[in-house]
């Protein structure tokens, strides 16, 4: 398939999980669709966070070279199922800490500039306590990611006021809000 003509220096991509045949063979499909890149999904707790495995990262990197596409970010949608704001002392705290730091490690290894976390459903910060714990985890992540040159982003359905409050609470240069017009 011929690549589309790009008159405005705009790049078009797609989320990995929106491609028929997700996973490490999605880059080929994305390339054949004429797109420039795709967001990679980090994976789920139930399936061992696939992108935390070096073999899977290497397969994606090989496909990236072979098909000439970009990976602008790693998406961590498991926040829909695993509470991102889990506080210290909670039985899930260590698992969540492992998940979020491994996502940053994967981005550093793969030279992907952004990791975004989905804060919907199980991760919705709908109380002040949850919002504070969410901000605390984002501060940790931003500090962990800063020397690796990784931006940390948050996708959530909070009101504009609550999102701006979160930005103020995190207060890190490498923190941003991620917007998906489909949510």
Where are the language model's segments positioned?
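Short, Lys/Arg-enriched N-terminal segments with co-localized hydrophobic residues
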Residues: 1-7
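Active-site acidic/histidine proton-transfer and metal-coordination neighborhood
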Residues: 3, 65-70, 83-177
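Hydrophobic faces of well-ordered beta-strands that scaffold small-molecule active sites
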Residues: 10-16, 38-40, 71-76, 115-117, ...
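Short beta->alpha connector loops
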Residues: 17-22, 44, 156-161, 182-183
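Catalytic domains of carbohydrate-active enzymes, especially glycoside hydrolases
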Residues: 23-44, 110-111
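Structural motif corresponding to alpha-helix initiation and N-cap regions
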Residues: 23-24, 53-58, 97, 101, ...
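Glycine-rich, proline-tolerant flexible connector loops at the mouths of alpha/beta enzymes
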Residues: 39-64, 119-126
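Aromatic-lined carbohydrate-binding surfaces of glycoside hydrolases
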Residues: 77-82
């Amino acid at each position: 398939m011929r690549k589309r003509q790009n008159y405005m220096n705009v790049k078009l991509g797609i989320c990995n999980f929106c491609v028929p045949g997700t996973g490490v063979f999605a880059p080929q499909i994305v390339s054949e669709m004429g797109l420039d890149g795709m967001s990679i999904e980090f994976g789920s707790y139930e399936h061992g966070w696939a992108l935390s495995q070096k073999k899977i990262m290497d397969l994606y990197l090989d496909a990236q070279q072979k098909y000439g596409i970009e990976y602008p970010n790693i998406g961590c949608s498991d926040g829909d199922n695993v509470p991102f704001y889990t506080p210290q002392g909670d039985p899930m705290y260590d698992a969540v800490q492992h998940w979020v730091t491994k996502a940053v490690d994967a981005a550093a290894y793969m030279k992907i500039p952004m990791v975004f976390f989905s804060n919907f459903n199980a991760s919705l910060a709908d109380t002040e306590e949850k919002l504070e714990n969410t901000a605390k985890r984002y501060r940790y992540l931003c500090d962990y990611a800063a020397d690796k040159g990784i931006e940390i982003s948050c996708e959530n359905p909070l009101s504009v006021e609550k999102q701006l409050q979160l930005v103020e609470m995190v207060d890190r240069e490498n923190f941003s809000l991620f917007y998906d017009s489909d949510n």
